[in-house]
Every structure is written in structure tokens, then in C-alpha cells.
């Protein structure tokens, strides 16, 4: 069901008679709960219903006991048209967000043993997770093809020359039909660590793409999507972290999470959402702590601090690479080169060629990803997740949530901006970063040092 713009929630007294929607058809005198699990909801708990009154759709809240519904005329309901908006959608969003993965699946995602060359894309939500996942996937598939040629006796120079002659994919058809895109949705080939078990994926299994020409292709390195903090991530692999201006993160998260949890747009205010996130509503913690944790785990190379948990066996290697969403927008080729160098496995020969970098950038272009949005919309994991939180199946078809966005902080309320800035000063300033721009500058300085090694 597509929900109309929110025009103000209404509260109805017990016994009021209204017209209520049974999904697409209107049936007078009935109430339909959008989320009802009798064994899990205590007596007296409230939950949302969709109603129709004078051709206006909105949300109301009524007792969970469906036997107590609506037996009287609409007069009392009419009187309460201007009632104070209820805030229960926020609680429903938090409840659903908490229930989106099973405890067993979370434990499996955090406790399995990665291979040393496995790469986790460990971003805070809305920092460019899907975009960086596509970058890493395109890097590994590019290297896979070159590895096949190398196995047939071709030298690196011969391989690069052959790729250069072919040219990068430029037409829509070339890109849409590329063998690297032979998946339904990208989490099928890049499992989400703490949701993989719920989705029937084995984190120890090979990650493969089937090609009509090449057959079954087992890709290396294996890639995993994650929003986990340093303290919760499965240790022993390699970790790519993307940071982003917290104001932009907040705006994008605010526009994304409620509909992702089946909550209509507009029923939660930016201020309410901000308070909830600050209070720990996100499974991933807060963005500031996430940034600081991954920055501190990446300082082994600076000799500032180290952790045996994340230290690679090779002293000359590193296993945490950090970049920014803004740098991906401003200079994607440089980010691709750095990702390629970071992801290099023992079987790889040489860095990515300029042709390789151009090809990867073509396949990670926003226009291309938007045109193929169904491959990047989480529908593979969302089907299972929505079953768990009991969002009605009839809503799935219209419930796609776009994940390819350029984003921007936009017109956030001043009170929200102040809270975001205050939190930065509390968490990041003591670490030596008075502002987000200072943090980005430090990340770039670190990456330049690695470029020169």
C-alpha cells in the first residue's frame, strides 16, 4: 500500500465508528492493525491503524484488543480532528529496527572467522555503504578476469594492453549486461554479516557469479557488508571504512530509516528522530563513536597505537583503509586506485591500470547505479527482515527504498544541527579533530603517506 503524505495524526476514543482500510479496499466499521503479534504485544499496548475520514488518510492509534473497536458514530472522532499528533510511530520504528535480525544471526556474523584477505565494508549507515560495496566488487571482478588471462600464460603487460584495446564499458548496454552484474541484488554476492544467517547465507562459503561464458566464477577476495563497530566486528580480515559529514548522514538516515521500517514518511519529525538516534535507536551505535573507533583501529601504520586483534601478519601491510564519501564524489578514480591497492591479494600482480580504474568508475557511476536500482535496494535481505518484523507482504512490492543517493544536509532544523555539532565536540574534538573537515584532512594525509610507500 502506498501511504499518502501525512496530514496530522488523529486520536479516537474507544467506541468511535470510523471507516478503516483493509489494505486497498474500504470496509466501514473495521480496524486493521499493520503490525499485530498477539503473543508479543502486552495488554494495553498501542499500535498504528490506517483510517479514512472525510477522504483524508492518516494514522490513528487504538487499543490492541481488536474486540474493543469502533461501535459508535463518528461524532467524537470528528471533534478530535485537531488532536495532538501521537509519537508512537517512533517507538514502532525502534521496535522494528531492533527486531530486524535474529540474535543467532547477529552472533554468527560477529563470531565467524574471516580469512586474512576477506574485506569488510564497515560504514555507519548512510555513509556510502552500497556505493563502496559496488566499488570493491568491481575491483575484484576486474582482477578476476586478469587472473584468468595470467593463468593462461599472459604477462601483465600483455593483459593491460589487451584490456586497453577493448576500452572501458561506456554504453548503457555494455554496462547493464556486464558479467560482473550477474546478480539479483548486491547482498547476494556481498553478504551482510549479521543478516546473512537469517537470509540462508553461509559466511564461510565461496562468493560466486555464474557467467554463460566463464561458468561459475569464485571471486576473491570475499566481501562482506557491515555496519558494525570496532568492538563488534568479526576480527581477522581487512576493513574499508567510509566516513561522511554527520549532518548529511543524519539527513539521509532520517529520510531512509522510517520507510525502510515500514513507517510512513512525515509522521516522525527530524527532532524526534535525532533524539532517538542520540538515545541509541540505531543498531550501529552513533556515527561519532563509529568514526572514532575505526580511525583508532587504523593508526597502527602511524605507530600511535596498535591492536593485536586487528594487526596483520605482514608488518608492511595494513588492514584498515578509511576514505570519505565526499572524496568519492570529488575524485572517485583516486579512491578506486587506493581501494585496489588495499584489496590486493597474494595472487594479484601489480596495481590497477588506468583502464581498470576507468572501467570500475564507469560501473560505479551514480546514473548507472540508479538505472539498475533494483540491484542495490537491499530487497534480498529486506524480504526476510520484513517477515521478521511482520510488515504485510502486500506492501513489499511498493516498499522499495532507494539506496543510491547523492544526499546532503539540506534544511535541517537548527536545533538538530546544534546537537550534531555538540556531539562532534564531545567525541571527536578531544581526539584532535575540531571539525569534520579536520577529520577528513587527517584521513587524506594518512592515505597520501600510504600512496607514497
Kindly label every feature range from the protein language model.
Residues 3, 54-81:
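Intrinsically disordered, low-complexity, charged/polar segments
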Residues 144-208, 223, 315-410, 445-448:
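The conserved 3'-phosphoadenosine-5'-phosphosulfate
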Residues 27-36:
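Short beta-strand-centered aromatic/proline hotspots
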Residues 238-253:
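Conserved phosphate-donor/acceptor-positioning beta-strand/loop module used by diverse small-molecule
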Residues 81-118, 123-125, 210-211, 216-219, ...:
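PAPS-dependent sulfotransferases, especially Golgi type II membrane carbohydrate sulfotransferases
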Residues 1-18:
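Mixed-charge, Lys/Arg-rich low-complexity intrinsically disordered regions
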Residues 11-12, 26, 342:
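Short, well-ordered loop/turn sites that connect or cap secondary structure elements
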Amino acid at each position: 500500500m502506498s501511504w499518502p503524505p501525512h496530514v496530522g495524526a488523529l486520536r479516537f476514543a474507544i467506541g468511535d465508528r470510523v471507516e478503516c482500510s483493509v489494505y486497498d479496499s474500504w470496509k466501514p466499521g473495521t480496524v486493521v492493525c499493520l503490525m499485530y503479534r498477539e503473543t508479543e504485544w502486552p495488554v494495553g499496548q498501542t499500535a498504528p491503524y490506517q483510517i479514512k475520514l472525510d477522504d483524508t488518510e492518516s494514522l490513528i492509534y487504538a487499543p490492541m484488543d481488536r474486540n474493543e473497536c469502533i461501535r459508535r458514530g463518528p461524532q467524537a472522532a470528528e471533534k478530535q480532528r485537531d488532536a495532538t499528533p501521537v509519537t508512537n510511530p517512533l517507538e514502532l520504528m525502534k521496535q522494528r529496527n531492533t527486531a530486524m535480525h535474529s540474535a543467532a544471526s547477529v552472533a554468527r556474523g560477529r563470531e565467524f572467522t574471516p580469512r586474512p584477505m576477506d574485506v569488510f565494508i564497515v560504514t555507519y549507515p548512510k555513509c556510502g555503504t552500497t556505493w563502496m560495496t559496488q566499488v570493491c566488487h568491481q575491483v575484484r571482478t576486474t582482477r578476476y578476469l586478469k587472473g584468468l588471462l595470467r593463468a593462461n600464460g599472459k604477462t601483465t603487460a600483455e593483459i593491460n594492453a589487451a584490456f586497453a584495446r577493448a576500452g572501458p564499458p561506456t554504453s548503457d548496454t555494455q554496462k547493464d549486461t556486464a558479467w560482473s552484474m550477474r546478480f539479483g541484488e548486491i547482498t547476494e554476492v556481498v553478504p551482510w554479516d549479521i543478516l546473512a544467517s537469517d537470509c540462508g547465507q553461509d559466511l564461510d562459503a565461496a562468493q560466486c557469479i555464474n557467467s554463460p561464458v566463464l561458468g561459475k566464477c569464485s571471486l576473491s577476495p570475499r566481501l562482506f557488508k557491515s555496519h558494525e563497530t570496532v568492538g563488534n566486528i568479526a576480527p581477522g580480515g581487512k576493513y574499508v571504512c567510509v566516513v561522511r559529514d554527520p549532518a548529511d548522514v543524519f539527513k539521509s538516515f532520517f529520510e531512509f530509516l522510517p520507510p525502510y521500517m515500514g513507517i510512513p514518511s512525515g509522521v516522525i519529525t527530524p527532532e524526534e528522530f535525532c533524539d532517538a538516534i542520540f538515545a541509541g535507536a540505531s543498531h550501529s551505535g552513533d556515527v561519532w563513536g563509529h568514526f572514532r573507533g575505526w580511525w583508532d583501529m587504523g593508526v597502527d601504520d602511524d605507530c600511535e597505537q596498535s591492536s593485536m586483534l586487528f594487526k596483520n601478519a605482514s608488518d608492511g601491510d595494513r588492514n584498515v583503509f578509511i576514505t570519505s564519501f565526499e572524496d568519492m564524489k570529488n575524485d572517485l578514480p583516486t579512491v578506486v586506485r587506493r581501494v585496489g591497492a588495499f584489496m590486493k591479494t597474494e595472487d594479484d600482480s601489480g596495481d590497477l591500470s588506468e583502464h581498470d580504474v576507468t572501467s570500475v568508475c564507469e560501473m560505479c557511476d551514480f546514473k548507472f547505479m540508479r538505472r539498475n536500482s533494483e540491484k542495490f535496494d537491499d530487497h534480498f535481505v529486506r524480504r526476510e527482515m520484513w517477515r521478521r518484523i511482520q510488515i504485510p507482504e502486500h506492501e513489499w512490492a511498493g516498499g522499495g527504498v532507494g539506496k543510491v543517493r547523492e544526499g546532503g544536509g539540506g534544511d535541517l532544523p537548527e536545533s538538530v544541527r546544534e546537537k550534531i555539532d555538540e556531539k562532534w565536540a564531545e567525541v571527536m574534538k578531544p581526539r584532535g579533530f575540531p571539525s569534520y573537515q579536520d577529520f577528513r584532512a587527517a584521513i587524506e594525509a594518512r592515505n597520501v603517506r600510504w600512496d607514497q610507500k
